Each structure stands twice: as structure tokens, then as C-alpha cells.
Amino acid sequence: MAVSAQLLVEELQIFGLECEEAVIEKLVELCILYGQNEEGMASELIAFCTSTRKDCFTLETLNSFEHEFLSKRVSKTRHGASKDKGLRHAGARDIVSIQELIEVEEEEETLLNSYTTPSKGSQKRTITTPETPLTKRSVSARSPHQLLSPSSFSPSATPPQKYSSRSNRGEVVTSFGSAQGVSWSGRGGASPLSLKVLGHPEPLTGSYKYMFQKLPDIREVLTCKIEELGSELKEHYKIEAFAPILVPAQEPVTLLGQIGCDSNGKLNHKSVILEGDLEHSSGAQIPVDLSELKEYSLFPGQVVVMEGINTTGRKLVATRLYEGVPLPFHQPDEEDGDSEQFMVLVACGPYTTSDSITFDPLLDLITIINRDRPDVCILFGPFLDAKHEQVESCLLTSSFEDVFKQCLRTIIEGTRSSGSHLIIVPSLRDVHHEPVYPQPPFSCSDLLREDKKRVRLVSEPCTLSINGVIFGLTSTDLLFHMGAEEISSSSGTSDRFSRILRHILTQRSYYPLYPPQEDMAIDYENFYLYAQLPVTPDVFIAPSELRYFVKVGLNSAISLQCQNQFLSGALALNSSRVCWWGQWPRSFGGGVGVENKSVSIMLK
């Protein structure tokens, strides 16, 4: 949902409220996080100011507004919406029941016809439409517009009006490095590339059985994670030993555990608990007092080491929080190739507009790929979005699987002339695919031999090496999920996105949040095997509904002055449902190359 800062300012000015630019930016972020439009957010804000009798509005007041007022109000609204959603699902079940009756009737009619002599007029013929005329040419010779005709799966589909009349086509929304004067075109399949999927220890390559996990198995995975990260923190900070959580001590103690909440609500600074590890604390829990900590950033599921006073064994007064330690960078070797710089194009779904099921954005993307011929194209799902109105209402005449196959065939055949390597990443919102995390790659058994060399179907999440440059890829809206749960206190100017990205790398996981969002179905045994970071990626790509950004971090080997910094030379991108182009030099792998701004990035 797009939120305009200008409209938000105008709504507040109606009530005589003047806010600083930083406050407006924070309000825009809250609008996206809590699904509010400009008018609704202004109304909630006025109600809060009236009830608390506040005349001026600061960032501190805004934090109180979020925790004490907005989250409670929105939770009630969502509870009411869940009831309405149940009614809509009931209507969808009726549609399915009618469809089943029609299919049974057709089967009976087919059985009856098998005992009679078929008439000449009963022979089936291929249905043709103006968009898909019947020709003698093979399917592969047709254009993408003919391959992906919406009339084949949605006769009522109409062209998207807003998309076709948009005025910002091709607009550059942000850039990094020497984006100006760079030739944004690759060599397609002309230059040799080394493409490898990394795992921890092996990547996920196929489906697995899920919905069979037991609670002790989940507990074991979480315990292993605490022990592994605790061991790294102990070695890095030279900690002698961890103390048991429930044992009183008059001297400062150092405790290892996982952050949790004392209730089912949202985490706040008064509801933080520390759940100890199995070896030292037998999994016991203790409330944490954060009043002595000047700076902290916490979320449920975070593995931390805390130092503090535990005189009673019933509450820890934390005085120090140890920062997590990221994994080392991957060091390129001879197998990673020795090519010149290469161009990567990234796009994320959905590839339809909200008001139409036609794939006009996808067809435009194919045109751009054929024009610019990038060396690698990374395409994130969803390809057929489960949240699309026509999908939710079951208005498609073809099965979800058939529509996806038609979409995938259009991408592969439509870009064949470019020679670009295709990396296809699934999404939990792909309506036809397995809704479990980590998510297996798509299956496509009918790939031609010439396409098998350039098409790579990978899992969600995935760690990919392109000529030794490591890309961390995830289509899950991790920024949105963790942004809604994280609490922080900081005397500096660090922003929420930088902190979240820091957590992802220091927790060494593509989804460190526990418990996860309600719509996330995580299989924890496979999560432990396939959703951990094998190395710190050079580039971390996380599409999100939140605003796009590019963030760069520092370490001792890199001296880049950048306003937004977060960690260890890694480069993080949120494409925010837009396309971006990137050019990567040979020297970028292993966390180097950012120093001279030799990486060029452009988001459109």
C-alpha cells in the first residue's frame, strides 16, 4: 500500500497539527506496518492526542502512540476482519461444491456416450480467440503476449487502467555507486558464469514431508540454535562461563538465552523474558529489567548474552547486552570463475496488477530482459498471488497449476533469445505451491535441453554464488515481520531497517523470529537444515511491502562514509516490488569492492 507523506501532512494540518520531517517519515512507516491510509492514521493520531492531552508531537510521543494506542486499536480491527473473511471463504466453498457437481455430471455424460456411436458434430476442436489464433507454427515460435493470453484462464480479464496510464514508467527511484554513465546492458549468455547454490551443509533441492513435526523436535532445534550462537559469543567475547538463570547471585552474572514475551501480545520493554539454554539453565525463564540499558534492540527469538544483577533469582537487571557475531565472508576460489564484471537484474512479484489478472507487468519485464540482455535475472515470486482478488474469489477458469505453468513457460521461452540466466525463487504467496517454510523449488520436468543450462529453480530462502559474489535471497517479507515485533532504545541515529538487517546477519538465519507470524508455516527440522546462512552474503536481497532502500555497512577493511551503515561490508537491498539493476566487479566477492564504489545499482 502506497502512502503519501504530503497527503499525511495535509490531513494533520486540517486539525492544526504541525510535525517535523522525521515524525512524518515515522508516521508513513507506521501507516504501512499497520495497514492504515493517510486519513485513518490522522484520525487515530488526533484521538490519541485528545485522550492524552498532548499539544506537541515528538518521536518519543510517537513511540507511545504506537505501543499504547495504535497496536491495540488495529488488533481489534483485524479480529473483526477475520470473521468477515470466514464468510467469504464459505462462499468460496460453495463455488467449489458447484464445480464438483458439474464435473460429476460431465463424467456421467462421458460414460453414457461411450455406449453410443459418436456423431460427427460431437468431435472436439481447439477453441481459438483473437489473442491466440490457431496457426501451423509451433508454440515456441509465438510471442510472449500469445503464450500468456488472459482469455485462456480468465475470460472476464480486462487490461489494467492504472498500469497502462502510469506516468513514471522507467523512473529511477534510487541508486548507489556510479549509476550515472554506466551502460546498463549485459552480454546475455555470451560470457561464462559460475552459478552455485550454497547450503548449510546442502541446499534444498526437492519436496519433503511436512506437518509431521512434534513439539520436542521444535524445542530441540531452538536449543541447538541457542547453544551454537552462545558458543560463538563466548569465544568472541572471551566469556569464562555462563551462569544458571534461576540461581541468585550478589555479583554480576552472564546469562545465555533466547528473548521471549511474557504473554501472547506484542513485545514491549516491560514484557521481556530471557529463556535460558538447556545446558546451564534447563530452559528456565526469567523476567528482564531493561531500565539500566542505554541502547538495545530486541525481538522474540533472538539469541543473546546478557550481563546483569540477579540477586533474587526472579528478575535480571540487565546492565550489558553483547552484540551478535556475523559469519565470515565467502572467499572466492578458482572454481568461482574469473570473468569480467557482470550485470544482474532482479524483479519480484506479484507480476499482475491489483485490479486485473493480466500479466502486463511481466510481459513488459520480458521486453526489458530481451532489450538489456542481463547476464543473470533473479525473479522472485509470487507468480500467481494467493492474495489477488480474482484468485481469492476463484474466478479463474483454469487451475492454479496450469496458470503458473503458462506463466513460467512464457518467461523461459520469451527470454530465450536474450541468453540470460534465470534464477526462479518461489514465494509462500504462490497459490499453487507448497505453503511451507523453507519452501522447495518449483518443479518443471518439461524443460528443453537448451533451457536447462540457463534456468535454475531454487528454494526459498537461497544462498547463491555468482562468480564468487554471494547473494542472500528470500522472498518472505522478513523486514515487515520483524519490524512489527522489534523493540529498541538508542541514543544514536540508527534506523529500524538497519537494526533488522544486523539481526539477520548476526543471528545467522533467514528467519530468526520466534514465534513466527501467524501466516508462516515453518517446518523446524528442515528450517535448521536449509534456512541458515552458510556465510555472510555480499549482497542480501529482501523484497518487502516497505519502502525500497540500499544499505551498505563497514568493517575494518573498508572505509566508506555512508549515511546508512549496518554491518561488515555487506550490501542490503529492499526492492519494494520494483526492478533493480546491478553491476558487480570481480573484486566484490568476500566483502570487498564497496570501498571504491565499484558496485553500481539502480532501482526502477
Swiss-Prot record:
GO molecular function: DNA binding
Keywords: DNA replication, Nucleus, Phosphoprotein
Post-translational modification comment from the UniProt entry: Phosphorylated in a cell cycle-dependent manner, in G2/M phase.
Pfam families: DNA_pol_E_B, DPOA2_OB, Pol_alpha_B_N
Intracellular or extracellular location(s): Nucleus
GO cellular component: alpha DNA polymerase:primase complex
Gene Ontology biological-process annotations: DNA replication initiation
Residue spans of biased composition, Polar residues class: 113-141
Main location: nucleus
Residues with PTM Phosphothreonine: 129, 132
Stretches the record annotates as Disordered: 109-171
Record text on subunit structure and interactions: Component of the alpha DNA polymerase complex (also known as the alpha DNA polymerase-primase complex) consisting of four subunits: the catalytic subunit POLA1, the regulatory subunit POLA2, and the primase complex subunits PRIM1 and PRIM2 respectively. Within the complex, POLA1 directly interacts with PRIM2.
PANTHER family: DNA POLYMERASE 2 ALPHA 70 KDA SUBUNIT, DNA POLYMERASE ALPHA SUBUNIT B
Domain notes: The N-terminal 240 amino acids are sufficient to mediate complex formation.
Function: Accessory subunit of the DNA polymerase alpha complex (also known as the alpha DNA polymerase-primase complex) which plays an essential role in the initiation of DNA synthesis. During the S phase of the cell cycle, the DNA polymerase alpha complex (composed of a catalytic subunit POLA1, an accessory subunit POLA2 and two primase subunits, the catalytic subunit PRIM1 and the regulatory subunit PRIM2) is recruited to DNA at the replicative forks via direct interactions with MCM10 and WDHD1.
Family: Belongs to the DNA polymerase alpha subunit B family.
Protein name per Swiss-Prot or TrEMBL: DNA polymerase alpha subunit B
